[in-house]
Amino acid sequence: MKKERLEQAAAFGKERAKKKKNTDTTSNLVPVPKGAKKEKKRVGRGPGSKVGKTAGRGSKGQYARNTVRRGFEGGQMPIHRRLPKRGFTAKFHKEFYPVNLRDIEKSGLTGNIDAKIMVQSKILDKETTLFKILGTGEIKKAIHVIADGFSQSAKEKIEKAGGSIKLRAEIELAASETKK
């Protein structure tokens, strides 16, 4: 009987050890080795600390007392004031996403190509994105492109292949006039 109870207790102890999940407790953590954690240097705390008195700032003067503002050049006229103002920021500037002819050729697009088709073929992210067709690459098949802009070389290459070009703004303008 006693032997059985001892076996049961041993089995129960094993089960209990299995159930124990987290072994990292504050009682069994080992301290980190010396030098593994760099301590912050405390300055200005007396001569025994090696960084007392002037606290690593040298002796007296402007830089020992405080910092100087960004762009300060010691009283000399700073560069942002020496250089003249130039140009202006356009109020209604439009950013065009560049699409090269090689991108159209690589995606295998043919026939009528507009923003919706470009989004489906993952050349553009959104239909509302303004995009300009540029002439890098060659086009072999005739394509009819509706875009927000064309470079001169792209126009020539598309028309040489037997295709046509139209500006999206002109089409939208014509559509709005027909509604009136």
Curated annotation (Swiss-Prot):
One of the GO biological process terms: translation
Biased composition (Basic residues): 35-44
RNA-binding found in the keyword field: yes
Keywords: Ribonucleoprotein, Ribosomal protein, RNA-binding, rRNA-binding
Gene Ontology molecular functions: rRNA binding; structural constituent of ribosome
Region (Disordered): 1-62
Pfam families: Ribosomal_L27A
Superkingdom classification of source: Bacteria
Record function comment: Binds to the 23S rRNA.
Subunit structure: Part of the 50S ribosomal subunit.
Protein family per UniProt: Belongs to the universal ribosomal protein uL15 family.
Protein name: Large ribosomal subunit protein uL15
Lineage: Bacteria, Pseudomonadati, Spirochaetota, Spirochaetia, Leptospirales
